[in-house]
Amino acid sequence: MKRIGVLTSGGDSPGMNAAIRAVVRKAIYHDLEVYGIKNGYQGLMDGNIEKMTLGSVGDIIHRGGTILFSARSEEFKTDEGQFRAIEQLNKHNIDGLVVIGGDGSFQGAKKLTEKGFPCIGVPGTIDNDIAGTDYTIGFDTSLNTIIDAVDKVRDTATSHERTYIIEVMGRDAGDLALWAGLAVGAESILIPEEKEDFSSIVQRLKNGHDRGKKHSIILLAEGVGSGFEFGKRIEEVAELETRVTVLGHIQRGGSPTGQDRVLASRLGARAIELLIDNQGGRMVGIQKNVLVDYTFDEVFNVEHTIDKGMYKLSKELSI
């Protein structure tokens, strides 16, 4: 193993730059050359590859986004696209690849590994929806962004005595809504993994109103449905003045938290160690603060689940 490639793919997440930095610096520490691949798998197929140095990753650990940019590619999902990618890797004499991204990115890395090119996955997604790791890079930063936004919304909700629906990201996973909801003391938390009867939500709001509560906060993951549609139903049935805030892509941006920077540094460095050991087809993760790694198949075959105890606690505290 003499040359390592690194790319970011799929949706960006705060801390990706910290992971890139760790990959580059760890590789150079072990006398390896590192090549950055811009624009994800599309850039790999197009040969958008350049050598990286210590200077390439200077002053980036605190920056959100990804200096390598990211893109989605339908062409790469085909065998032809994957062979084009391998041709570019061979052309640049790259021996192993670090892929920073989510589930879809790892599907691509698995395909390359099956075609004989070793890849290691580093989980970077704000959704925290990947099995085999307690946390993904970017989750903590996004969580804190949501908390900060909801705290501000609560100020105006209190002033105007309104019920606010806060829609957050999470198409298939409700970790962001659950963790943020518990952190801000939301009256209701709606996530894809748990179905809640609409009438019970309305009753909880009415109970609060009857005992003098003047405002309420509801956290809703986008996978549950439209915040605007839900808010309309609440207003019609509960007869409470309602407003909706969709946080959108602000959840993906911003300077990463200390936790995300440390996690990204640890996972990025571990990815290089696995490649040096001639391993491929694996994802690095963290469980109970210990670094772990699993095959891509092991990751794909286990469904990510929410913390049932935390969900139960959120229900108990929102009476």
Curated annotation (Swiss-Prot):
Active site: 127 (proton acceptor)
Gene Ontology CC: one annotated term: 6-phosphofructokinase complex
Catalysed reaction, written as an equation: beta-D-fructose 6-phosphate + ATP = beta-D-fructose 1,6-bisphosphate + ADP + H(+)
Compartments (UniProt record): Cytoplasm
Annotated residues for binding of ATP: 11, 72-73, 102-105
Binding site for substrate: 125-127, 162, 169-171, 222, 243, 249-252
Keywords for the protein's UniProt record, in alphabetical order: Allosteric enzyme, ATP-binding, Cytoplasm, Glycolysis, Kinase, Magnesium, Metal-binding, Nucleotide-binding, Transferase
Keyword Transferase tagged: yes
Recorded metabolic or biological pathway in which this protein acts: Carbohydrate degradation; glycolysis; D-glyceraldehyde 3-phosphate and glycerone phosphate from D-glucose: step 3/4
Molecular functions per Gene Ontology: 6-phosphofructokinase activity; AMP binding; ATP binding; fructose-6-phosphate binding; identical protein binding; metal ion binding; monosaccharide binding
Superkingdom field: Bacteria
Binding site for ADP: 21-25, 154, 185-187, 211, 213-215
EC numbers: 2.7.1.11
GO BP of this protein: canonical glycolysis; fructose 1,6-bisphosphate metabolic process; fructose 6-phosphate metabolic process
Cofactor: Mg(2+)
Binding, Mg(2+): 103
SUPFAM superfamilies, sorted: Phosphofructokinase (SSF53784)
Protein family per UniProt: Belongs to the phosphofructokinase type A (PFKA) family. ATP-dependent PFK group I subfamily. Prokaryotic clade 'B1' sub-subfamily.
Subunit note: Homotetramer.
NCBIfam families, per the entry: PFKA_ATP, PRK03202.1
Name used for this protein in its record: ATP-dependent 6-phosphofructokinase
Name of the encoding gene: pfkA
